[in-house]
Amino acid sequence: MSFVALIPARAASIRLPDKPLADIAGKPMVVRVAERAALSGASLVCVATDDTRVERAVTEHGFPAVRTLSSHPTGTDRLAEAVRILGLPGDAIVVNVQGDEPLIEPTLIDGVAQLLADNPQADIATCACPLTDAQALFNPNVVKVVCGNDGRALYFSRAPIPWARDALAGGERMLAPGLPAWHHIGLYAYRVSFLQRFPTLAQGELERFESLEQLRAMEHGHTIVVSRISAAPAAGVDTPADLDRVRAIYLQAPKTEANQGLIQVQSDQGNDGR
């Protein structure tokens, strides 16, 4: 199986300006993400950015980059432009690796790519881990997914789904025992043929209300398959505190990017379960 890892990277960030360029043990964060992705089975790791500084930082460290428009409404639209620039064939598989996840496990990248390759009826593959506390279940910033027995996504929501009617009848906010609640992890593998169609798909009501772009694919009849993993992966970088945590992990790790094992052990200690 062959696939491409694409890393969208925008410098604009409200909570952490110039986030892709933030230094982590001597290298920009986007380069650290690319190094992690390069440890996967990807045949190509490429950054898609609308920022000259990000492009220069990436290429100076030996990774290719493509310049994309700054006007894209979603990250998926940016991926669609990137695959067009790269000239990827419609049957190719692309994994969207978020540019703020310098602790991402290479095996997770391989896993979603393999899942899509194994499910020819699907256009998208992603992953989810068990929800383990009520606070996360009721947190609208934690996206939930419910799946069929075949692993196909039935719905994604910011609401607490599935709803435990009897356990929550009194208005309590609790995680009902045995509730099959899953936290969606925002790592996606796409078929290029789907990415080529995505910009032409009209936004539907579900996407507008939930503000979840994967619902656009589902509203238009596209199949998403979900790998259910046992535990949450290391959290990404959203705040200055997150950045400090990741910097500490890298500074404690051996001076080789191949030693992903130690980085993962350290990251597990700082995982906030998102």
Curated annotation (Swiss-Prot):
Pathway note: Nucleotide-sugar biosynthesis; CMP-3-deoxy-D-manno-octulosonate biosynthesis; CMP-3-deoxy-D-manno-octulosonate from 3-deoxy-D-manno-octulosonate and CTP: step 1/1; Bacterial outer membrane biogenesis; lipopolysaccharide biosynthesis
EC identifiers of the protein: 2.7.7.38
Cellular component, GO annotation: cytosol
Superkingdom, natural source: Bacteria
UniProt keywords, alphabetically: Cytoplasm, Lipopolysaccharide biosynthesis, Nucleotidyltransferase, Transferase
Catalytic reaction annotation: 3-deoxy-alpha-D-manno-oct-2-ulosonate + CTP = CMP-3-deoxy-beta-D-manno-octulosonate + diphosphate
Function recorded in the entry: Activates KDO (a required 8-carbon sugar) for incorporation into bacterial lipopolysaccharide in Gram-negative bacteria.
Annotated family: Belongs to the KdsB family.
Protein name, UniProt field: 3-deoxy-manno-octulosonate cytidylyltransferase
Organism whose genome encodes this protein: Bordetella avium (strain 197N)
